[in-house]
């Protein structure tokens, strides 16, 4: 065997010695190095797989949360779109298209009930309030349906106003009042207040030269000037008229009481509007109301009696006096025209409206006087 040692063992180990089968010979150190590198790459692959798994789990969680949020926002958007669609169903007269699926279950099926069925929305996104004939009356009746619910007060001013109602024998009999705290008084006051607000908030704001308060002050100044020893002259301003309102309202109350003594039914604060009238804009040439609109109003009767107004075009209650001849002549002979010109000239110059022609100023001024007089009485 000693002769074969040189075949298996060389004195100097050759590097990359050719093998008999043409295979490179690797040392154990190289093999260990290759194994270490393979293990390291495998470990990196495993770590990368774990990281990808964690990222996919986190992405799935975020996508689930985003899906839930989008679903919630979509539901809210659909509800808003449904409310907007319901609001757009209103016509100019406040009617609603009753063929929608959402309202189909809430609307009476029979034609007889459907003709009497109406609904009103306060704001576009609120549910509808349904009523049968009169929304205002049914709402007020609902408020005062249960006496046990009314355990509060509006203050001393409301009690004083109820006392005025209770002290009127005619109202006490008509409303069947037994005590001043009767809910019938509060019910009637609320109805009167709503009616007054309705009249005070529908006047046109386009092309108006003066406000309803300014129109009221012009009428009151003309009324006050008809009394002897009145404290107004050509230097009087609108502010001066406001300071004189307590004195003017005392005289106004005396005139109304005198008219009431002559005719108990003559103290009517209202206008004879046609039944087909929808807006308080004068429809006759854009300036005049229908005939006899002012016919029964107590303030008109009082102004005519004091000579503040000579004639209202088309009215049967006026005197046979043609004010047209005085409009461009001696203007001082017409008291209302004169004081309107005196008080509004600093603001409007020569473009001062004449109330008997631009009658929406006359009407808005009368309604403002009613409101101011009511506040003074309270």
Swiss-Prot record:
Bridged cysteine pairs (disulfide): none
Keyword Glycoprotein: no
Subcellular location: Virion; Host nucleus
Keywords, ordered alphabetically: Capsid protein, Host nucleus, Viral genome packaging, Viral release from host cell, Virion
Keyword ATP-binding tagged: no
Cross-referenced InterPro entries: Herpes_UL25 (IPR002493)
GO biological process, one term: viral genome packaging
Highest taxon, organism lineage: Viruses
Signal peptide residues on this chain, from the entry's feature table: none
Chief location: virion
GO cellular component, one term: viral capsid
Coiled coil: none
Function: Plays a role at the late stage in the encapsidation of viral DNA, assuring correct genome cleavage and presumably stabilizing capsids that contain full-lengtht viral genomes. Located on the external vertices of the T=16 icosahedric capsid, may bind together the tegument and the capsid through interaction with large tegument protein U31.
Family label: Belongs to the herpesviridae UL25 family.
Subunit structure: Heterodimerizes with packaging protein U64. Interacts with major capsid protein U57 and triplex capsid protein U29, essentially at the pentamer vertices. May interact with large tegument protein U31.
Record's protein name: Virion-packaging protein UL25 homolog
Organism: Human herpesvirus 6A (strain GS) (HHV-6 variant A)
Organismal lineage: Viruses, Duplodnaviria, Heunggongvirae, Peploviricota, Herviviricetes
Gene that this sequence comes from: U50
